[in-house]
A protein has these predicted regions:
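Short glycine-enriched nucleophile-adjacent loop
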Residues: 218-230
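Substrate-access "cap/lid" subdomains that shape
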Residues: 99-101, 197, 201, 208, ...
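Fungal secretory targeting signals
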Residues: 1-26, 532
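Mobile gating loops/cap/lid regions near enzyme active sites that modulate substrate access
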Residues: 394-532
Length: 532
């Protein structure tokens, strides 16, 4: 069983239901509109209410439709001389399960990015942000992911789209023989390549780029560090997750055959499958079963090009960007929301552990059954959600921190602020911290009922975060992480929200150290989707 539409949004820490509004980025008219000349075209944006320049929907690659469906991202076609690209509206959202009003309209011409920058400045630090959504959903037009708070503090903020689910990770037997078919990961690389080549035109320093993300966005950050050991990034932010967080992987062509049958195309064994599937309208993929279940089966394959099985061996061989300072951490109740997200399949804990979504095949089941007691939780679903939080978020962060912190400057946080920011469970759960790290203000515009106290916390969080982005090597204001048991920052602690308290990771990682971490070197294990 997969994601329901509203619950997909919960994974991103965004507003839902009646609390949701979807405003365009705030703007004002100030004389002539700002223009930036790029090799692909001149782009024209607008000034926001703080006189920052904003450019939305700039293509960083060609359309992914037609013959480019299931190809690596292709270069942007050159524009005619004198072309001025209108960058005042968000671009299309990449195709994904279910269509809705939260993001812009879906279209395969979706590899676009957004830039917020001060009106004046040069050689400014750059923060590139990647949204989350389990690699099956999400988009940079999410109203909580605006960059005004960074531009006001002389940091250029960039967000971008990637392909999702079946369009990003088809896991096809026809592909992957000579190059990676993890197209979503390749999209990330293309976006960062664009930033390196073009951000100076917006006043940014291509030699001072920090790449960060939340949930699957931070998994993408980690893939980039593993795939580019010599990267010029000066900092990385992994909020909640990393390369050991998943997603799960199905056998080659298994998921694609099931979807192909639904849309009237042959199986992989019959031949001509991709040729047929390339002709299917993107909305025709959105069958009821695809939207509720199948969409989660399409995830990055272990190709040992863009996703690896032996990260431990790569680290030992120096094939990881250990020179890049890393900020990582979690909210204090990551799993709470997942008791709802997977509520249709997690009320039987024993059965839940066998599902594709739980994705814990590498861990002996008896250990997992012994590690959780339903009397400690409000329901079996709540216990299953907590287990999911351990498996996907807390323990991967703990495991790779143990592995890497001896050779990589690493700082860890834990977010305690008890605010729901539109989520239907008490905070802080998965995604709660996002609008606080991004500084609130416009990032809170889509959520009703935000208090002055919440904005004060967002100001505090964003201030130290921006200071770290400007000088990652100096650290964020607390001690570096160490393996097993070390210092971490407690953020948003009740009664002392506008301060950073210190804690010890050893007070929180017991179940990771004893149950999960010993088996994470074996992750991922192929999972049969027909048994999900």
């Amino acid at each position: 069983m997969g994601f329901l539409h509203g619950l997909i949004s919960l994974l991103l820490g965004i507003c839902i239901g009646a609390e949701c509004r979807n405003p365009r980025a705030a703007r004002q008219v100030v004389g002539g509109a700002p223009r930036v000349k790029l090799p692909q075209a001149t782009v024209e944006g607008f000034f926001d209410l703080h006189n920052n320049t904003v450019f939305l929907g700039i293509p960083f690659a060609a359309t992914t439709g037609g013959p480019n469906r299931w190809r690596a991202p292709q270069p942007v076609p050159p524009a005619r001389p004198g072309t001025v690209f209108n960058a005042t509206q968000y671009g299309a959202t990449c195709p994904q399960a279910i269509s809705g009003a939260l993001y812009t309209q879906q279209d395969e011409d979706c590899l676009n990015l957004n830039v917020w920058a001060p009106a004046k400045g040069s050689n400014l630090p750059v923060f590139v942000y990647m949204y989350g959504g389990a690699m099956v959903t999400g988009g940079s037009s999410n109203p909580q992911l605006q960059g005004q708070n960074f531009a006001r503090k002389d940091v250029i903020f960039v967000s971008f789209n990637t392909r999702e689910s079946i369009f990003a990770y088809p896991n096809s037997a026809e592909l992957g023989k000579t190059e990676s078919q993890n197209f979503g990961i390749l999209d990330v690389e293309k976006a960062l390549e664009w930033v390196q080549r073009n951000i100076a035109a917006f006043g940014g320093d291509p030699n001072h780029v920090v790449f960060g993300g939340h949930s699957s966005g931070s998994v993408q950050v980690d893939h980039y560090l593993w795939n580019h050991p010599q990267t010029k990034l000066v900092g990385a932010v992994q909020m909640a997750a990393n390369a050991k967080s998943g997603p799960a992987v199905a056998p080659t062509n298994q998921a694609l055959d099931i979807v192909a049958t639904e849309v009237g195309c042959p199986s992989g064994a019959q031949g001509g499958q991709l040729e047929c599937l390339r002709k299917v309208n993107l909305y025709d993929f959105q069958t009821e079963k695809f939207n509720t279940t199948y969409n989660t089966w399409f995830t990055p394959v272990v190709d040992n090009v863009t996703r690896f099985q032996d990260y431990e061996g790569r680290l030992a061989a120096g094939k990881y960007a250990s020179h890049v300072p890393l900020l990582t951490g979690n909210s204090n109740a990551e799993g709470a929301i997942f008791g709802l997200v997977y509520g249709a399949e997690n009320s039987d804990f024993n059965a839940w552990l066998d599902t594709f979504d739980a994705d814990v095949a590498e861990i002996p089941k008896d250990l997992l059954l012994a590690a959780y007691n339903v009397s400690d939780y409000a329901s079996v679903s709540a216990m299953s959600g907590a287990q999911y939080g351990d498996a996907r978020f807390y323990c991967p962060v703990d495991y790779l921190r143990d592995l890497r912190s001896a050779s990589q400057d690493t700082w860890t946080y834990r977010f305690f602020a008890n605010y729901s920011v539109g989520l239907p469970v008490p905070g802080p759960t998965h995604g709660t911290e996002i609008p606080f790290f991004l500084g609130g203000n416009e990032c809170f515009d889509a959520i009703e009922g935000i208090t002055e106290t919440e904005q004060a916390l967002a100001d505090f969080q964003n201030d130290w975060f921006v200071a770290w982005i400007k000088n990652p090597k100096a650290g964020p204001g607390w001690g570096r992480s160490t393996p097993k048991n070390g210092t971490f920052a407690k953020l948003g602690v009740s009664g002392n929200e506008l301060a950073i308290e210190l804690g010890a990771t050893g007070d929180y990682n017991g179940i990771c150290q004893s149950v999960y971490n010993p088996y994470l070197p074996e992750y991922p294990v192929l999972l049969d989707v027909t048994a999900a």
